[in-house]
């Protein structure tokens, strides 16, 4: 009978913002605009880096990968969050929950490692520019990107299997926006010590290690920037580094805070805000931060725009005709 009760759950109820009934439509509008900006900005980056031959460099190769990851992991949860804001039925099937958790953890883990690869790219470009094309060959770039994706995949497989091997004994209400590891561990009626150990271990490998590598890379970059003679050049370089580091601290800070701590310390009502930062806000800010001061991207966008725009002479001839 106990085994039957443990396997009886066929769906989960996502509570999300159910306590804010009067703000449901406002929140839907905010999430919709954020998701629209995320898709638009990241799709533009992918199209630009693929179609412009001048952007076929390691930096933009990694940036294109980052844009694709941001689209995927935002799509894994935000559309469902918007549906639940306007729907009375706020449920997700057991299988749907498995798929959502796997996808989200896969893409978040891959992004953690990819950001470190991007920092390494910037370190070589600024601190060792003469050997940049030799060190960061096409083969190495492909290997780095593939390693990020593979490690993210394996990390997701481990946590998905461990999470859904746990028993769920009747209560199926997830006090969160989507199916994520911490709320499911809290919901489980089994022993989660193995899951917590796995979170801590992978948190060190996928969270803290790449984060520290990024910080060390930017320390070297900043020390090189300080030797730039032009004050204007130093100012622009510092401004770019500061914006990149702001995104890194926001993403890693919220992700590490969410996953790398004991389950007993979780307060899902408070932690929901943190989850919004790295799952909704950061993917929208990435294309802005990484392309705002980038002249190459701006020029490429103008070039693409001019190709889609018909010549004025042809328009005049059509109008006169």
From Swiss-Prot:
Protein role: Odorant receptor.
InterPro entries noted in UniProt: GPCR_Rhodpsn (IPR000276), GPCR_Rhodpsn_7TM (IPR017452), Olfact_rcpt (IPR000725), Olfactory_GPCR (IPR050516)
GO molecular function: G protein-coupled receptor activity; olfactory receptor activity
Annotated protein name in UniProt: Olfactory receptor 5V1
Protein family according to the UniProt entry: Belongs to the G-protein coupled receptor 1 family.
GO cellular component annotations of the record: plasma membrane
Disulfide bonds: 97-189
Localization: Cell membrane
Signal peptide residue numbers: none
CDD domains linked: 7tmA_OR5V1-like (cd15231)
Organism: Homo sapiens (Human)
Keyword list, A-Z: Cell membrane, Disulfide bond, G-protein coupled receptor, Glycoprotein, Membrane, Olfaction, Receptor, Sensory transduction, Transducer, Transmembrane, Transmembrane helix
Glycosylation site positions: 5
Membrane topology: Multi-pass membrane protein
Residue spans, topological domain Cytoplasmic: 47-54, 121-139, 218-237, 293-321
GO BP of this protein: detection of chemical stimulus involved in sensory perception of smell
Extracellular face of the membrane: 1-25, 76-99, 161-196, 259-271
TM region(s), chain numbering: 26-46, 55-75, 100-120, 140-160, 197-217, 238-258, 272-292
Keyword match Ligase: no
Source organism phylogeny: Eukaryota, Metazoa, Chordata, Craniata, Vertebrata
